[in-house]
Amino acid sequence: MATPTLTFTSSDGVDIPVERDVAERSQLIKNMLEDLGETGEPIPIPNVNEAVLKKVIEWCTHHKNDPPSTGDDDDSRRKTTDIDEWDQKFMQVDQEMLFEIILAANYLDIKGLLDVGCKTVANMIKGKSPEEIRKTFNIQNDFTPEEEDQIRRENEWAEDR
């Protein structure tokens, strides 16, 4: 039997067909369908453009048979920054797309994708100095040298020795 299909409309007005079981990886969409039922009308996704929405749907399609997320109680999974190989390849995108995927996953309440996106950013930061992190994310240092010294002294206890 064919899987029912929904239509998402991206913020830039593009209609994208999505299998219902794929769409329901989004807790937001799943709850909406449970509350309102399926109307056959396109579902507007106002905060997500076509390119990002297609990436999110690609991830959801790959993970559609994963067990549902159990919520925040799985501490061991959250504490690791390990990412499976498919997800690592999926997240090999430019920084702007990576951050857009994270924002979309948060908006659509797709916990697994949000975790993978955040772990990807964590791995980009891991082991880097503040200067290297600023360079990676193109962040301007707005501290004076005196302020920076004071912050280093106040946080000496947290430094790796």
Curated annotation (Swiss-Prot):
In the UniProt record, which is one GO cellular component term?
Answer: RAVE complex
Any single GO molecular-function term of the entry would be: DNA replication origin binding
* InterPro entries attached to this UniProt entry: SKP1, SKP1-like, SKP1-like_dim_sf, SKP1/BTB/POZ_sf, Skp1_comp_dimer, Skp1_comp_POZ
Q: Which Pfam family is one of this chain's hits?
A: Skp1_POZ
GO BP terms in the entry = exit from mitosis; G1/S transition of mitotic cell cycle; G2/M transition of mitotic cell cycle; kinetochore assembly; mitotic nuclear membrane biogenesis; negative regulation of cytoplasmic translation; negative regulation of mitotic metaphase/anaphase transition; positive regulation of D-glucose transmembrane transport
Q: Which domain of life is it from?
A: Eukaryota
- Residue numbers spanned by region Interaction with the F-box domain of F-box proteins: 102-161
Keywords associated with the record: Ubl conjugation pathway
Pathway listed for it? Protein modification; protein ubiquitination
* Subunit: Component of the SCF (SKP1-CUL1-F-box protein) E3 ubiquitin ligase complexes.
According to its UniProt entry, the function of this protein is described as:
Essential component of the SCF (SKP1-CUL1-F-box protein) E3 ubiquitin ligase complexes, which mediate the ubiquitination and subsequent proteasomal degradation of target proteins. Controls sulfur metabolite repression, probably by mediating the inactivation or degradation of the metR transcription factor.
Instruction: Please report which protein family the annotation says this sequence is part of.
Output: Belongs to the SKP1 family.
- Record-given protein name: E3 ubiquitin ligase complex SCF subunit sconC
Which source organism does the UniProt entry give?
A: Aspergillus oryzae (strain ATCC 42149 / RIB 40)
- Tell me the classification of the organism that encodes this protein: Eukaryota, Fungi, Dikarya, Ascomycota, Pezizomycotina
